[in-house]
């Protein structure tokens, strides 16, 4: 019990969406970010995520991995990732913003050296969002990259 208490204390904010798989992805990525001196903020306003769990986990895993990697590449003094998730009518909206080097949002490709083995994350997000009858937009402004994903039920 003592060890569990220490783990809960170490994780400054535990995410609860009502979907344990989604919660696990967000909490694990948050713990990783915090352990690399990246502030990780959650603004979750859903009680249950009744959408395709595998699809949402694929989207979140890739988007949060991209956000962490972008933060690690920047020289900014304060690095952060903010994830917001809420429902509006029959839509699930996911917004992620993070510190980033400049990005051409019209040409999102990998910045890694081994390009053939990378760059699949954004393509996976695109395909998964489309398969869930949704859409997404990306924006870069003054040191911050953001992605907004809208999924229809």
Task: Mark where each language-model region is.
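Glycine-rich/acidic phosphate-handling loop/turn and adjacent ATP-lid/helix
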Residues: 90-120
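Glycine-rich nucleotide-binding loop
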Residues: 102, 141-148
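Short beta-to-alpha transition helix within the HATPase_c
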Residues: 2-6, 10, 18-34
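Short beta-strand/loop element within the Bergerat-fold HATPase_c
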Residues: 78-90
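Conserved ATP-binding N-box helix of the HATPase_c
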Residues: 53-76
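Conserved short strand/loop->alpha-helix "switch" segment adjacent to the catalytic nucleotide/phosphoryl-transfer site
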Residues: 14, 40-60
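Glycine-rich ATP-binding loops of the HATPase_c
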Residues: 132-143
């Amino acid at each position: 019990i003592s060890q569990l208490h220490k783990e809960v204390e170490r994780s400054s904010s535990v995410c609860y969406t009502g979907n344990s798989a989604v919660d696990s992805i967000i909490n694990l990525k948050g713990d990783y970010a915090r352990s690399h001196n990246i502030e990780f903020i959650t603004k979750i306003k859903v009680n249950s995520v009744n959408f395709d769990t595998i699809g949402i986990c694929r989207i979140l895993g890739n988007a949060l991995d991209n956000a962490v990697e972008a933060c690690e590449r920047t020289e900014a003094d304060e690095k952060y990732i903010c994830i917001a998730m809420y429902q509006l009518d029959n839509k699930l909206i996911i917004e992620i913003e993070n510190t980033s080097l400049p990005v051409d949002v019209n040409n999102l490709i990998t910045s890694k050296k081994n390009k053939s083995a990378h760059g699949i994350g954004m393509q996976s997000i695109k395909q998964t969002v489309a398969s869930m009858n949704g859409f997404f937009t990306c924006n870069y402004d003054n040191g911050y990259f953001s992605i907004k994903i809208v999924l229809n039920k």
